[in-house]
Amino acid sequence: MSEESDSLRTSPSVASLSENELPLPPPDPPGYVCSLTEDLVTKAREELQEKPEWRLRDVQALRDMVRKEYPYLSTSLDDAFLLRFLRARKFDYDRALQLLVNYHGCRRSWPEVFSNLRPSALKDVLNSGFLTVLPHTDPRGCHVLCIRPDRWIPSNYPITENIRAVYLTLEKLIQSEETQVNGIVILADYKGVSLSKASHFGPFIAKKVIGILQDGFPIRIKAVHIVNEPRIFKGIFAIIKPFLKEKIANRFFLHGSDLNSLHTNLPRNILPKEYGGTAGELDTASWNAVLLASEEDFVKEFCQPMPACDNLLGQPLLPEGLISDAQCDDSMRAMKSQLYSCY
């Protein structure tokens, strides 16, 4: 059996306190049952500082911090939900709390994206083939989110609808504990992206999207692979680079039309034939069905009125470290120069 076959895995359908400060917690209650394999438990321990024997103690510590510091924050406090934030910040309580606050702050600060966020409201985007999740994970166990901007026709709906579809997909993926530990990989195909289409993704949109992905959502982005990027992508990347932290910027890989380069990172046996793979034609319908089957969950989470008292005592809820509006203006001018210089 080849090395690629051995690595093939099928995706599912879908600063801690010192150990001496608190006693060991009792066994996990029925409310939380760990679904991680032994290998993933080991990986979580080594990479995320997650210790099964302290897991519920850590969750309780974060829960207590939320209740004390943000008593009016309308958020789930169940074990499984809070674990997402602890894992995303390697069980550093303070950073996990900030991520949780940012998560809700981002949702409140961009109603065009987060209001009425449910699969049935995004059928046009889903049916366009703009995005899907490949049926197999990569050798590291990462889900592969495939995005194809050329499938978007701007006259049909605004770019924010695409962003809503991406966020919807991330919300579904992060429900899996496997994804919380392994993270995801993004494969973006920029074939056919024109100057007029690229101009819709300006610095103001980029600032918000990058802010959410880096500071406002509990997911680990392990790599971003760009293929078939036209000359215009030099301008697109100039838009987003100022907002990227060095760690994530170093995880961008531009392959052009060199599929052999892509295959050194994503093996052929997990890729559809459109990208030189052996996993059949790209299937978008299966992932669409997964999302549409989750309609009720999204209605409960994103389609309920916000409690009047949920204002976090008037504190701002925007991710820290984002570039100012003045800098956005500078980026817009630079972006226009970059875009036109590509032609």
From Swiss-Prot:
Composition bias, Polar residues: 8-19
Highest taxon, organism lineage: Eukaryota
Signal sequence annotation: none
Official protein name in the record: Alpha-tocopherol transfer protein-like
Residue numbers spanned by region Disordered: 1-29
Keywords linked to the UniProt accession: Transport
One protein family per Pfam: CRAL_TRIO_N
Limits of the CRAL-TRIO domain: 118-283
Record function comment: May act as a protein that binds a hydrophobic ligand.
SUPFAM superfamilies: CRAL/TRIO domain (SSF52087), CRAL/TRIO N-terminal domain (SSF46938)
